[in-house]
Amino acid sequence: MKSYQNEFIKFAVEKRVLRFGDFTLKSGRMSPYFFNSGLFNSGASLARLGRFYAQAISGSGLAFEVLFGPAYKGIPLVTATAIALMEKYGRDIGYAFNRKEVKDHGEGGKVVGTPLKGARVLIVDDVISAGTSVREAATLIHAAGATLAGVAISLDRQEQGQGKQSAVQEVEAQYGIPVVSIACLDHLIRHLEEKPEMKEHLDKMQAYKKQYGVERVFNP
């Protein structure tokens, strides 16, 4: 685990985005942790989150020309990431996002921001649960004459969905692209291993991974 990944986990705990305990997920599955990126809800926290995304993206080596944020959660994320890539790495990357409703006046269309045609596009989102927003974004990107280069998310839960694959693995297999995450389940476990006072939570996380976990293919 890289130092920035450990810092991200500490940051997420501090903001109560990441909590350890007993939680029931939408799927009905019992989970020993809960991750709610909506609590990154201030200017300072969003700016810092953008820097973590920029670090993960830059470290991945992915080639792209445009960032894309799926509405609605992806819009502040893609904006913060574009700013961080400029401020931290000197990369002035265009960004775009989609509307949920089509406008018939003004600039019109479903995509707002940098034109996508001919570009390699990296989607920036919070997590991939069912993969719905990523698939919708991929359809828009391809319809605009662009190429999907990959997806960047904050946390990869590394757990099976309905089948043996995780939602992340399903997206990677369907589109033949890598999904980059700031952190993943393995990193959460390593973080807890360094905290003896969190042993009860560590045991639950390890048991959860044993029951539902999948290995990451792209895990820098």
UniProtKB/Swiss-Prot annotation:
Keyword Plastid tagged: no
Binding locations of 5-phospho-alpha-D-ribose 1-diphosphate: 26, 72-73, 99-100, 103, 105, 125-133
Keywords noted in UniProt: Glycosyltransferase, Magnesium, Pyrimidine biosynthesis, Transferase
Reaction(s) catalysed by this chain's protein: orotidine 5'-phosphate + diphosphate = orotate + 5-phospho-alpha-D-ribose 1-diphosphate
Annotated GO CC locations: cytoplasm
Any one GO molecular-function label of the UniProt entry: magnesium ion binding
Pathway: Pyrimidine metabolism; UMP biosynthesis via de novo pathway; UMP from orotate: step 1/2
EC numbers: 2.4.2.10
This protein's name: Orotate phosphoribosyltransferase
Presence of keyword Phosphoprotein: no
Binding site for orotate: F34, F35, S129, R157
SUPFAM superfamilies for this protein: PRTase-like (SSF53271)
Description of how the protein assembles with itself and partners: Homodimer.
Species whose genome carries this gene: Nitrosococcus oceani (strain ATCC 19707 / BCRC 17464 / JCM 30415 / NCIMB 11848 / C-107)
Pfam families: Pribosyltran
Similarity comment: family membership: Belongs to the purine/pyrimidine phosphoribosyltransferase family. PyrE subfamily.
Cofactor(s) of this protein: Mg(2+)
